[in-house]
Amino acid sequence: MSMKSKFMYVGIRVTDLERSIDFYTNTLGMKVSGRSKIEQTKGETVGLQTEKDGFTLELNYYEKDSPYNTKYVVGEGLDHLAFKVDDLDKALEEAKKAGHRTILQMKADGGRWAYIEDPDGNWIELF
C-alpha cells in the first residue's frame, strides 16, 4: 500500500530575494503569504501564492557564509514553472516592460504559450 499524500508547493533557490519577490509579485501577480528567517541554514524563505488557485511557490535564499549557498546552476533538475494568464499577449508585453525577455513562443494543437526568465534564469511558462 502506498502513502497517501497531497502536493503542497514548489521551492526554488534564489540569489537575490528582494529581486525575486519583485518579479513574482509585480510580473506574475503573486502575493506574499509568509516570510521567515531560518537560523540553522543562515537563510530566509518567502512563500508566495497565486490569487486564483492558491498555488504556493517558496523562494529560498541563503547568506554567503551558509553551507547551503552552493554554486547556483540554472535548470539542474528543474525544467520550468507554468502559470495560466488571462491574456498571453498582455502578459508578455507587461513582462517586456518590466525588463524580462521572452525566450520562446510556441503554437501547437490550437494553443499558444511562451517562456520568460525569472531574475535567476529559471524558465517561466505563460499560457
What label would you give each PLM region?
Residues 20-25, 95, 121:
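Conserved active-site tyrosine of GNAT-family acetyltransferases
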Residues 19, 88-92:
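Short, conserved charged micro-motifs
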Residues 16, 87, 118:
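Acidic di-acidic motifs
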Residues 34, 126-127:
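Short beta->alpha transition motifs characteristic of CBS
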Residues 1-8, 31-82, 92-117:
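Vicinal oxygen chelate
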Residues 11-13, 82-86:
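Short hydrophobic/aromatic beta-strand micro-patches
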Residues 14-17, 39-40:
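Conserved beta-strand-loop-alpha-helix junction that forms the acyl-donor binding cleft
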